[in-house]
Structure formats: structure tokens, C-alpha cells
Amino acid sequence: MIHSFGDSFTAGLGVDREYENSQLGGHPDWDVMTDDEKNTQRSKVERFRNKNSYTGQFARKIGIGCSNKGLSGCSNVDILNSIFEYGDNFKQGDIVFVGFTSSLRNPISFFPRKFYKTDFKLAPNLRVLKDFTELKVNEKILEYYSEESMSFFLEYSKFYLTEMFDEQYYEIVNYNIIVFLQKYFEYKKVNYIMLDAFDYMVNKNYEHIDTKYYWNFNKKTIYSYIASFNDEDLLEVEGYNLHEQTPRHPSIEGHKILAEELYKFYNKVYK
């Protein structure tokens, strides 16, 4: 059995944006569907994405079943929690893929805790953060803090971005996440492969990270690998991401190429 955990790059979002949209908000009957009917459509699209994701294509290549737990927009802390909560389902010899996302989606310990009740994230990724002049907050935050408090926070966020932000904070957090999961997978006796979706988890090799099972550690991400082919057909069509700086997801063909690459890597380290 294959189990995969990660963000939208693992879940399969964008494998065929036109089809996905035609079954969701772009469906001619979407506005008159009941909630149950909309949920049926969402489940249909989720199955389509999972089938065509690198997990699904890898599983078919070696002829075993798979369970894709990828979740669009999640953080690396979410991925850690999902793995540990689901881990009782792992059997010895199972394969586990972990597609890490941007560190900037993790909760920050030195910001007020109620921010995270509104799904607050520093930024979707590093490329987007570099263009921010202040941090973005959800209007729902006003349910927890006054306008005066938020006025201060937005002003402080300008100072934070120019004077306080330091990637080293995430290095230490990510180092611990990686090592915890590697030790857990060793304990569970599963065959795991880690990879980065579009931002690197860490910028150097720390003492206790076993890079043997980490695909192209600190060299390539899913996005950079797919983009290196200079083939637009390997990426989702443009115009669907909220920020222009957000790396585009792999298409069905992009996931196919990644699955083939991971198949070679898996055989190299486990056979």
C-alpha cells in the first residue's frame, strides 16, 4: 500500500484545471445544486485528482493500492499531524510519500494564538512574501481582536517584514519535523520518500537528516523539476492561482513524469 501526505502538489490540484472547474464552480448547474450535490461533485473531482497525481500514477505503475491524504493549502505542521494520526494504518513494507510545502504556512509561536483560528498564514510561499509590504489577515480576525489591535498589528507587520523576518526560524522547525518523521518511519518499518513541493525545507544538510531517502535534497523541488523541461503541457494552465508568483501545479503529464522519476529513485534506494 502507498500512503501520501502533502499539499496541493501531492493532492493533484491542477492536473486538468479546465475539467476540474467544469465540474465545480464552472458547472452550468452549480448555482442551483444542493449542498449534497456539490459535495458529490467535489468528491468526484478529488478522486480524479488523486487518480492522476504522482501517487496514483506511481501506484498503478507498480500495481498496488494507494491512499492520497494530500490537502490543498495545508502547512508542514498539518502534514506532520496527519501522518502521526494516520500512522496506525501503516503496515511494515508500505510506501509513504511526504511532499513538504512552504514553511511560511506554519503557525508562528510569537504571534497571538487566535490568528490561527482564521487560517492565518505568513504567506503561501517565499516568492509571494517577498512582494508583501505588510501581512495579510482575514476579516474574520475582527471576531477575536478589536480594530485598534489589528491596526497595531498591520503596522507592526511592516516592521516585521523588513527587520525581523528570518528564514533561520523555519530551518530549526523544519529540521525537527524532518527528523521526527524519519525516525517514526524507521520505527514503523515503512519505505518512505520525502520531497519538496516548491520551497526547500532547509538550506543545508543537518547532522541527523538522512538524505538517502529525500529526493534531490536541497537541489530540486517538484516545481523546479517539472519546469526544467520547458514544456507548458507539463504544468497547469495559467490564470488559476491567486498570486502570480505562486508556482504552477503539474498537469497529468507533469505528474506522470514525476511518478516515473520517483519510481527510478525508489528502486535506487530500496532495491
Where on the chain are the PLM-derived regions?
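Serine-esterase "nucleophile elbow" of acetyl-processing enzymes
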Residues: M1-D78, D88-N89, I257
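Alpha-helical cap/lid subdomain in secreted, periplasmic
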Residues: F84-K271
